[in-house]
Swiss-Prot record:
Enzyme Commission designation: 3.2.1.35
Organism of origin: Tityus serrulatus (Brazilian scorpion)
Protein name according to UniProt: Hyaluronidase 2
One of the Pfam families matching this protein, by short name: Glyco_hydro_56
Residues at the active site: E122 (proton donor)
InterPro entries found in the cross-reference section: Aldolase_TIM, Glycoside_hydrolase_SF, Hyaluronidase
Residues carrying a glycan: N39, N103, N200
């Protein structure tokens, strides 16, 4: 058999193995198909990217519930109007769960749905201290509530009780909503969007300041109930325009690495549950596409940490015109599809060759550069001494020991 034939056989065998690295397309690209006959899905599916039937935003592969789509989510809007009670302590949780049950069964009609379910609640945070900027209103309203009941208490006691009541209520709301979703659609994995956060927005010319600070680690551990109840973790590593203009490439690598490693750390609270980071192809608040090398590197970083995949999110805002749809189509064809194909191929190759197909490869001594191995389209050589395996149902450096 000549070398070309051997290469073809190797490729076919590897591709026959079910990909351990899954990329979900969460973009309403049906708008391009219906309005302008620009079909992005054919390119995506031919490169094993998971797309909902009919190119819908919510469907058989992935669903996302925004704040107004799931139950009676309490929040305070931009005009200071209190919606559904405004703050958690006075909102009706039972009514919320009753409505949420109908929402879930309607949006996810298949009781055997086995995709990814995402809850996107962003108006407030369960950690009291992280409700800053616009979210400070929740702390103020919580303090006012305690003050109205106990006007004689000193301010420090009022704030301590307000914090305790807020965090207790947040836990109850988030856990019971997750449990409901898991009971109704038990074959799916469920997560809250953008949890955990790392709040690593400083700009320094070394890795450590871009890592999660100790305060964040401590507070993320305090909400261990969230990681224990979740069956997936879905942090956001969206590339921002400010990252491109203010950060060097090395700093962008460090920023993403810190956020991913915090997700990995917290996943251990619940038997190493799968991690699906949210990534983007359009810079938020702009019409600019993510630079090609940044997109490639981001996907490579996710895979090089042994994670299960990624969710590629996009808004209908960028699909209203024919020119916008053409930009999306070209980026999918020339950047997203070939990058995903290469990363999936190399992830599977390394898994089969080094981890016996029982886990994914990690390069612990090369935390900021190992992504390059998985972006190499020329069948890179994987050196076992540089690799440890993130194993599924096995133990040992190379997943050689059954649990």
């Amino acid at each position: 058999m000549n070398p070309i034939s051997i290469f073809s056989v190797v490729i076919s065998v590897i591709c026959a193995v079910q990909a351990e690295f899954k990329v979900y397309w969460e973009v309403p690209s049906f708008l391009c198909s219906k309005r302008f006959n620009i079909n992005v899905t054919q390119v995506l599916t031919s490169h094993k990217i998971l797309v909902n039937q009919g190119e819908s935003f919510n469907g058989d592969k992935i669903v996302m519930f925004y704040e107004n789509q799931l139950g009676k989510y309490p929040y305070i809007d931009s005009n200071k109007v209190e919606i559904n009670g405004g703050i958690l302590q006075v909102a009706d949780l039972l009514k919320h769960l009753k409505v949420a049950k109908d929402n879930i069964t309607n949006l996810v009609p298949n009781p055997n749905f086995n995709g990814v379910g995402v809850i996107d609640w962003e108006s407030w945070l369960p950690t009291w201290d992280f409700n800053w900027d616009k979210m400070k209103v929740y702390r103020k309203k919580s303090i006012d509530l305690v003050k109205s009941k106990h006007p004689e208490w000193p301010s420090h006691r009022v704030e301590n009780v307000a914090k305790e009541e807020w965090e207790k209520s947040a836990k109850e709301w988030m856990v019971k909503t997750l449990k409901l979703a898991q009971e109704l659609r038990p074959n799916a994995v469920w997560c809250y969007y953008s949890f955990p956060d790392c709040y690593n927005y400083s700009r320094k010319d070394e890795p450590s300041p871009l890592a999660c600070i100790r305060k964040v680690l401590v507070e993320n551990d305090r909400i261990s109930w969230l990681w224990k109840q979740s069956t997936a973790i879905c942090p956001s590593i969206h590339i921002q325009e400010s990252h491109i203009t203010k950060y060097s490439m090395s700093q962008r690598v460090w920023w993403i690495d810190a956020r991913l490693r915090e997700a990995v750390r917290l996943s251990m609270y619940h038997r190493n549950i799968p991690i699906y980071p949210y990534i983007n192809y359009i810079l938020p608040g702009t019409n600019q596409i993510v630079p090609v090398m940044d997109f490639k590197r981001t996907l490579g970083q996710i895979a090089s940490l042994g994670l299960e995949g990624a969710i590629l999110w996009g808004s209908s805002y960028h699909l209203f015109s024919e020119s916008q749809c053409k930009i999306t189509f070209d980026y999918v064809k020339n950047v997203i599809a070939p990058t995903v194909a290469t990363v999936v191929l190399n992830t599977n190759r390394c898994s089969q060759l080094i981890c016996k197909g029982r886990g994914n490869c990690i390069w612990p001594a090369e935390p900021f550069s190992s992504w390059k191995y998985l972006l190499d389209p020329k069948m890179p050589v994987f050196k076992p001494m540089k690799i440890i395996c993130k194993c599924k149902h096995y133990l040992g450096r190379y997943c050689e020991i059954p649990k």
